[in-house]
């Protein structure tokens, strides 16, 4: 199933039995659709997950019990955002580690178990990544996967494929505290910022604000250590990236 989390901390559980038609046309999903139009986060929940970690632009986060989120009344205020807003969230388990990434190219790795599981409904944001640079803010939160290559995309179209942390000489070490500033993940120039990061199995498609798109096979991108600048992937202002599946034409083999 999936969870939709609005920028102001309201949540909706989308069970497997809800069809696309039900969601698009159902009056009961009107507020949820409006929240998605305003930048809500769509989170996939694996069966092994027991927690939902909600992350705000200012780097603060909170860990909530997933079973309570799933059974909550649709649109319930599960977290109080105060003067910030939710930018990302992920479903995870007690044994997982999380990777926080900021727009200035900083990254922080932390164990989920270091965060207290908050059972009080509508609680505020607490621990997280310490945002120290002016104009910086958190942009992504992922379940850390050291055996996979992380692809990082910048607003000005730079594409960076990192060595897996099993291979890299500059590893993303786990933090000992619950609020630190992070390490350098991607080297940026001028006003460029990170807009997305993902673990892609086969390919990545970069999307710009004027409707252009360009795809890359992950295996065709040279993998490097963190704190590198990456290659030019596409011209224009990138707004996000999505994972792509590559199919091979049997007649061309």
Where are the predicted features?
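Short, structured "edge-of-domain" segments at secondary-structure transitions
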Residues: 1-253
